[in-house]
Regions:
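Short, well-ordered loop/turn elements at secondary-structure boundaries
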Residues: 152-155, 162-166, 175-176
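Segments surrounding the PLD/"HKD" phosphodiesterase catalytic module and close analogs
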Residues: 167-201
Length: 228
């Protein structure tokens, strides 16, 4: 029995290594295509460097996990250790790990508490937002401060700034761990899980979908330019 367990473990490690290598190859090939045809990409992509930051070492990642009493989702962990610690991506790009814990849109730039569980499992927004009379002004500061508090996004990383203070979140603690959410509180639209075909999506699914959409846009632009 002992030998069988060792062999199975070895096969799982080999399989996981092959999956990682294939994903890395696929992502880098797609990145290279986008880089070659950047002039045909969407506006947000044109404003970015089509490259990645240096990877984090295993020691750096373990230190981060130990400090915050979490383990990062496997696909994201692999990405920052094998492909890059931030760089080209949705919105204004992927934020590096050390910046993803800082809520940059708040004046005092507080850290997000990762050792607390992400508080939501379904889409959330405050009820007062739909009943508030926006023609008469804005809510009181205390109400807004409570609404945009980092307590609503505890247990998540702000991995990408979409624009206007809205961000993409990767949940790293709680029932939604590993899933991507959209934080639209800067536009008073609350917190919403990202879905694909009605299902929650992981970091790597979200990221590869972004690359595929950009490639589709480029191919369409290339086709239009040759037929014009």
């Amino acid at each position: 029995m002992g030998n069988k367990r060792i062999n199975l473990s070895g096969k799982l490690i080999i399989h996981r290594t092959l999956v990682i290598m294939n994903q890395k190859k696929e992502i880098l090939e797609k990145l290279a295509f986008i880089r070659r045809h950047k002039e045909f990409a969407s506006f947000g992509v044109k404003e970015q460097e089509v490259s990645y930051n240096p990877c984090l070492s295993e020691e750096d990642i373990k230190e981060f996990e130990h400090k915050h009493c979490i383990t990062l989702p496997d696909d994201y962990r692999t990405f920052i250790s094998e492909i890059g610690n931030g760089g080209f991506g949705p919105g204004y790009g992927l934020l590096p790990l050390d910046k993803a814990i800082v809520d940059f849109k708040l004046r005092d730039k507080p850290n997000i508490s990762l050792n607390e569980k992400f508080p939501y499992q379904d889409s959330w927004n405050e009820e007062w937002i739909t009943s508030f009379n926006w023609d008469e002004g804005y809510p009181e500061t205390e109400i807004v401060d409570a609404y945009i508090s980092t307590s609503h996004i505890a247990g998540s990383l702000q991995i990408s700034h979409f624009g206007h203070g809205c961000t993409f979140l990767l949940v790293v603690n709680g029932n939604e761990k590993g899933h991507i959410w959209f934080d639209g509180r800067a536009d008073y639209s609350g917190l919403v899980p990202k879905l694909k075909d009605g299902q929650r999506i992981s970091f790597i699914e979200w990221y590869v979908t972004f690359l595929d959409m950009e490639i589709e846009n480029i191919n369409e632009s290339l086709t239009n330019s040759t037929t014009a």
